[in-house]
Regions:
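Short hydrophobic/aromatic helix or loop-helix immediately within or flanking a transmembrane segment
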Residues: 1-38, 201-202
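Loop-to-helix entry region of an early transmembrane alpha helix in multi-pass inner-membrane enzymes
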Residues: 23, 27, 35-57, 86, ...
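Transmembrane-helix motifs of polytopic, lipid-linked glycan transferases
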Residues: 30-31, 46-66, 231-239
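Transmembrane-helix signature of polytopic, membrane-embedded enzymes
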Residues: 39-43, 59-80, 114, 244-251
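Specific aromatic-rich, kink-prone transmembrane helix
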Residues: 58, 77-80, 95-114, 133, ...
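Membrane-interface transmembrane helices that cradle and orient dolichyl/undecaprenyl
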Residues: 69, 103-114, 141-144, 287
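Short acidic/glycine- and proline-prone juxtamembrane loop motifs at membrane-interface regions
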Residues: 89-95, 269
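Membrane-lumen/periplasm interface segments of specific transmembrane helices
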Residues: 133-142, 146-239, 245-253, 306
Length: 317
């Protein structure tokens, strides 16, 4: 489980291959543990749960600002999503969710300085953070056109600098600025260490698994879940495109889905979808009650099974 590595980094610093995990979450764990004199594990849980609570409040306000989104429905859809139990675990999902939601909310309010600062923290937490620049940059262009507003433009350029800062550290520490990519194969799941695999190849691989592995095998079940989540996410974005949602929302959420697939696998995509915040706003705009009934029934069932397996120590994403 990733949480073990975050706790190890917080306590001992990076060891071989752990560069795959971005640094801000373990740094905050270490800081909280020292000032509060608590264990690293407890500090991590406090950070995750507090971040998610605050992030959820901001998410609700963001939904209220968004045309066509239904705020309460969006919150419920997020809470019952099959992998949402990770928000309470020692993973970066909660911290990233908080930062990314504030970035999008601040962008909608045209508070670009705040968006830039939180975007910097987001890209120091997860690779997806750099794609927030698309949302903020798109809104900047809608407000200012191509005119230069120095303070706001420079603020938005902070967003990718979180990733840049980590890459500079990696170059200094291990001589490889993209060690977070090259270390991926060490953690299994069939990821490549830098070779790009096109999505059609990945889908073909999953098709072969589902047609050659016996259906009662755990491998088949995991592959089916990962593929279904990916296709569901892409379908929601297609519906959003047809409905005329902001192109920046669609691009960002699409990047969250597609970029992991470029490593040759859809492993963890169901969990990464929690980072695709606009996806849940789009979901909340659907009008079919039958769809929401089926969504809730399936999501809650998978949530219960996934959480039970996770609590027993199984890797479920």
């Amino acid at each position: 489980m990733d949480g073990v590595h975050y706790l190890s980094i917080a306590e001992n610093g990076y060891v071989q291959f752990e560069q795959a995990f971005f640094p801000l979450y373990p740094l905050i764990i270490q800081f909280i543990s020292r000032i509060a004199n608590t264990s690293y594990a407890l500090s991590a849980l406090i950070i995750s749960n507090a971040s998610f609570f605050v992030g959820l409040l901001v998410f609700y306000r963001l939904a209220k600002l968004t045309d066509r989104a239904k705020p309460l429905r969006a919150v419920i859809l997020l809470l019952v999503f099959p992998t949402s139990f990770f928000f309470a675990a020692t993973y970066t999902e909660s911290l990233y969710f908080l930062f990314a939601t504030v970035v999008i909310f601040a962008t909608k309010k045209h508070r670009f300085v705040l968006a830039g600062i939180l975007g910097f923290l987001a890209s120091l937490t997860r690779l997806f953070g750099v794609f927030l620049l698309v949302i903020s940059g798109y809104e900047y262009i809608k407000v200012y056109g191509y005119r230069i507003h120095a303070r706001h433009m420079l603020s938005l350029l902070l967003i990718p600098l979180g990733l840049v800062a980590y890459m500079i550290y990696l170059q200094y520490a291990v001589g490889d600025p993209i060690a977070f990519i090259h270390a991926q194969p060490a953690f299994g799941a069939g990821r490549t260490g830098g070779t790009i695999v096109l999505p059609p190849q990945v889908l073909w691989r999953y098709g072969k698994i589902l047609t050659t592995v016996v259906p009662d095998s755990p491998v088949w079940a995991v592959a089916f879940f990962e593929l279904t989540a990916f296709l569901f996410g892409m379908w929601v974005l297609y519906r959003g495109w047809r409905a005329g949602w902001d192109a920046s929302y669609l691009f960002y959420s699409g990047a969250v889905l597609v970029v992991p697939a470029l490593t040759g696998t859809l492993s963890s995509v169901p969990r990464y979808m929690l980072c695709a915040i606009p996806l849940f706003l789009i979901l909340s705009s659907f009008s079919s009650r039958k769809f929401y009934f089926v969504y809730a029934l399936v999501s809650i069932s998978v949530f219960i099974m996934g959480a039970a397996l996770y609590l027993q120590g199984y890797f479920v994403g």
